[in-house]
Amino acid sequence: MGLPPTPSNVGPVPGTPAGTPPEEPDGDIAALAKGGRTNFFGFLLRLAARLPFLFIAGRLYGAAELGRFASALVVVELVALLCSLGEKRGLAQRLAEGEGKKHPTNVVFDGILLATLFSCLAALFFWLVPAPLFPSGEYNWLDLLIVLAIPGYALTEIVLAAQAYKYDIATTVRARAVVEPWTISIMAGVFYFVPVLQSSGLNLAYLISIYAGLATGLWSFLKSYGLPKGWRPRPRAMSRMTVRALPLATADAIEWGTRRIDIFLLGLFAAPAAVGVYYVAQQVASLPQKLKTSFEPILGPVITKNLKTKNYVKIAQQVCQVGFWITAMQAGIALALGVPGEAVMGLVGPNFVGGTGALAFLLAAEVVAATAVVSEAALIYVARVRNLWISIATIAFQAVLTVGLILLVDEFNYPEPYKAAAAAIALMIALGLASLVKAILLGRILGHPVNNWRWAVVWAAAPAVVVGYGVTRLPEWAELVFGIPAILLAYGWVIWRKGFGPEDRVLFRRNVAPDAE
């Protein structure tokens, strides 16, 4: 698909004389770099907080209890995402369109009211009909309280999206990387030692963590936006807003669902303990996935502002730049977590080591998915319906492939861990195809190729694999303490020298700031 657009190969920006360097791309790239850099530190905080939770959940609660928790979690978060009506990315466009016309707080409160209404109705439904949450039929009234997380999750998405529109990524980091993960880790440990709450400890800890994150987001939101002025519900306008948001909300749910449908299908074909093992592998693999979401809040506002001026060259440049940043960082982290995978999974508990194969394929899936994610960040604004159909086709293909591979494992009488690996392979293939199709579509719409792949990633991976193979000869604790940093160092040294040019290194220059806040 050619070289990724950069200031040196995309030509002059429309509206500027030929040969005149564009004035704004540096500011936009700096804004993207600043937001991504802030959230990258948030990723490191997530890593530090996620591991204690997995350790507590695996060692204290066990794989079967984790599987039961994961089944409920899938439904709760999917429904909450639908109830947020795609505001995680759609709010930026509504705020941009309303500039100078409506008070921004009023725009946000339209979404908050709708999300509250839909999420409360959903919570009531699942309280009365809990079977989808607990397919095993094992639950009590304390477990059912997890439905109260649906409104909290949906509202958190909206207030954090509002802050991101003002380039305030630090609030997202505080809520998602500090408050939520540390709250669930601490409370899961506390509830385990309270006999009456022990069996529902994971569900209750999750519920508390969601509202702790919401409180963090609301504090910053009210300070920066304030209370609405002259706002009142407008049923007709909100009905139009709901209809308009459906494609985006569905696309969000499908994109999220591609990383959860595997758990649902495993629950139908595998034992609860196998689902719990896969959930742990997925949680470890989702750590590099957070690097993609690091750029989503800031990429949306930047793209919408360039769409207003129809500056497609700059959009292509930004998508490719962010795509390479994500791919390069994810590949390094995937190697660091995947090569010593047995030690990583063994940290949670000896019964989880069987999920090492699934972990490897899940980490690879996150790397190949980077192109799809950054392409979709633009497609939701320029080809919303076509993007939706591609997403639907992706999850349908993944579901069919997952079931087919699991049945193949059964046919050859392989043990349960192979079913988890089969689900991970299906995810990797589906996300890879989605990346290819979405990049081609976006390139045709913008009139410029979209390709964030560079062979330097392969050259950097080679020494990292060699180092990783060496550290697997060490004791497990040494693999984790010394091996992971050594792999990252080997990979980072090569990718910095061979893969990163001046534009790429903006991500690591703290003295570069966007022109406009």
Predicted regions: what they are:
Residues 3-17, 28-88, 123, 149, ...:
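Signature of the first transmembrane helix
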Residues 4, 8, 13, 113-254, ...:
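Hydrophobic transmembrane helix module of multi-pass membrane transport proteins
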Residues 58-66, 143-144, 166-171, 182-215, ...:
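Membrane-interface helix-loop junctions in multi-pass transport and translocation proteins
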Residues 34-51, 205-225, 234-305, 325, ...:
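Transmembrane helical elements of multi-pass membrane transporters/channels
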Residues 11-32, 195-205, 216-259, 298, ...:
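Interhelical loop/hinge segments that connect adjacent transmembrane helices in multipass membrane
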Residues 152-176, 360-394, 441-446:
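Membrane-interface junctions at transmembrane-helix termini in multi-pass inner-membrane proteins
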